[in-house]
Amino acid sequence: CPALRVGALSHCLLPSRGRVGVAGVRGLELRELGARYADEALHLMLHELERRNVRAAACNAKIFGGGNMFPAQRGAGVPVGRRNGEAARQLLNAHGIEVVSESLFGQGHRQVVFDIASGDVWARQLPPTDGGAGASA
């Protein structure tokens, strides 16, 4: 919510722990939630918005990522990056948060800069670093 100078950023590794769906986090205490999971990260963000008396629907979202970090690895199923991006879209929609900008999928990773004072985000997509055999920082 740029007008309120409230913002959040999460780098999700997985859509969920596997035992919960994108419909919500069930059976976990707030202190047990992990921001590495998209559904739990959003739950933590919503909790902090509520603590600040900010309605989630008054906010907007910009989502980035979902790139295939390991395109050389041909496995079965949908790549985790795509699953993360799709989960982010579904979760935000389920909570009435409008996505105003996105840069999702493709190959490689993104570098993101988030200016919380203005709400501006800059991102650039970079190719996989080593042919998909492993990740580097």
Name each model-derived stretch.
Residues 20, 72-74, 112:
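Short, well-ordered secondary-structure micro-motifs
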Residues 83-137:
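Divalent-metal-activated hydrolytic enzyme cores
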Residues 1-52:
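Conserved mixed alpha/beta catalytic, RNA-binding, or beta-rich assembly cores of soluble enzyme
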Residues 4, 33-40, 44, 58, ...:
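Conserved active-site and cofactor/substrate-binding residues in soluble primary-metabolism enzymes
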Residues 57-65:
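Short glycine-rich phosphate-binding loop at a beta-alpha junction
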